[in-house]
Amino acid sequence: MTALSSENCSFQYQLRQTNQPLDVNYLLFLIILGKILLNILTLGMRRKNTCQNFMEYFCISLAFVDLLLLVNISIILYFRDFVLLSIRFTKYHICLFTQIISFTYGFLHYPVFLTACIDYCLNFSKTTKLSFKCQKLFYFFTVILIWISVLAYVLGDPAIYQSLKAQNAYSRHCPFYVSIQSYWLSFFMVMILFVAFITCWEEVTTLVQAIRITSYMNETILYFPFSSHSSYTVRSKKIFLSKLIVCFLSTWLPFVLLQVIIVLLKVQIPAYIEMNIPWLYFVNSFLIATVYWFNCHKLNLKDIGLPLDPFVNWKCCFIPLTIPNLEQIEKPISIMIC
């Protein structure tokens, strides 16, 4: 009886060990599916006609790669064991593909951040004058080049290759890469926001108390009740910075608090989850605000061509709007997207 009981326990342990990767695979499927739904929701909430910048093209490419990963996982989960182009695919390839994607996503933060920053600087200075079609092709091939370069680096790095090779097909665990780039990028942005807020916290407090949320031209805006400038150049950099902070936090405050928690607690999030479209749009708004700040002396309000933000309406946040009969405009509403 004892021997039989031991054999049963051994069999149950082996069965549990065999089914473990399958449970992880279904969990990965649900996570990627949830991420894709978040991508669709975020892309649907953005302002339209804002596709003429690098970050927009990269966000669309990221959504496509996530969808491609979900399709691969679904096919492998459905067929479980099949041969394609003389290559045998099993459910253990789900972990392998997701690990490769995690490494790729993890190394994309710095290149995307720097490329988007250069793109906004060039567009703001108007040093590049490309036609609409040429600009679309340029962004398209730039995004493709970044993806291919990072993927080639991941597949060609010996340390990454050994890490992937060490995870054999029957491993009970499927560890994923946690990007150090995203942590330091979050730390960098949170510290800059903190220093900027401390520098002009009095102006920010005054603006928040005097600000009005109203509807203008079928759009909900922030209205700053200040007198119009005698010239068409923004002079007070401190007041301008406070308006940028108010506009930024009016949209991204929950995300800023989330980044503070991640930085302080050093939360380890797998790279295939951490690289997402809401995060990219958050970085995008931060970059636009930074470009405005460093070029505030060039902001000509008569002939202004501001980068379009899918979520933050920067123009109505710092340009002195002359709105006649403000009292007759619709009453302020509680839900607002700046």
Swiss-Prot record:
Transmembrane segments: 24-44, 59-79, 94-114, 137-157, 178-198, 245-265, 269-289
Glycan-carrying positions: 8
Extracellular side: 1-23, 80-93, 158-177, 266-268
Subcellular location: Cell membrane
Domain of life: Eukaryota
Chief site of localization: membrane
Swiss-Prot/TrEMBL keywords: Cell membrane, G-protein coupled receptor, Glycoprotein, Membrane, Receptor, Transducer, Transmembrane, Transmembrane helix
Cytoplasmic compartment spans: 45-58, 115-136, 199-244, 290-338
One term of GO molecular function: G protein-coupled receptor activity
Gene Ontology, cellular component aspect: plasma membrane; receptor complex
Gene3D superfamilies noted in UniProt: Rhodopsin 7-helix transmembrane proteins
Membrane topology of the entry: Multi-pass membrane protein
Function: Orphan receptor.
UniProt family annotation: Belongs to the G-protein coupled receptor 1 family.
PANTHER family: G-PROTEIN COUPLED RECEPTOR 160-RELATED (PTHR15573:SF0)
Entry protein name: Probable G-protein coupled receptor 160
Gene behind the chain: GPR160
